[in-house]
């Protein structure tokens, strides 16, 4: 538990970024000097109590906390931030059990039907979903089955103004057998569903591992993307000079493409976590 001690240790780091940081008692001020709304994934900062994380994130300049269960949404809202991506449920097999298997549809639809109206009421703009593990399915079969399932929930998402973001993950290092492991395939699903409320969660860490060519891919598919996650390659650590990507250039490409959603930092800090988060914010604040 870091709490107030961690907050105090951040004073020097925050001072270095004084053009971007806004105090938590000045809600009328913009949270960012740049064009991208930035967020922090909750699980990467699990040792920090959520209210403390919210206060720290707001001081750094972030506007949201990402990947929260519904019981935590109000905590974030009470601290003047947004839950940028909500979970529809708690399940150990959440990633593997996705829309590419018709046997999962009843459960997935029930979870989303219960959660989307709550998200709409509480101002949560996005909920996360998964394509699921391949388990021998062809690309064509998985695509058709995903479209079939997502078509059954898109009307509710449109009605509630909540976007279902289906995540792209790598199957090479972290999630063996995951079917949604290439942008072009995921974009075909989104195109076939044809709803402004069903989009891709483009995880830059995962797609750099699988296919690279990140900036061109983002430009090509920006209309299919509803949300971004960051994470350095290799290792899923800080967005610094140990990584393959020029993160400032990536962020600038996203902003230049007219993206208005959230970029959530989902890296595992190797140093002081809030200092690393402040540095990532500054890097991507374009």
List each model region and its residues.
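Catalytic domains of carbohydrate-active enzymes, especially glycoside hydrolases
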Residues: 52-73
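Short acidic, glycine/proline-enriched helix-loop-strand junctions
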Residues: 73-87, 146, 162
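Conserved beta-strand positions in the central sheet of alpha/beta enzyme cores
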Residues: 64-66, 85, 128, 165, ...
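Active-site acidic/histidine proton-transfer and metal-coordination neighborhood
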Residues: 3-11, 98-199, 209
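Active-site-proximal loop/turn and secondary-structure-junction residues that shape catalytic pockets
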Residues: 44-46, 69-71, 89-91, 133-135, ...
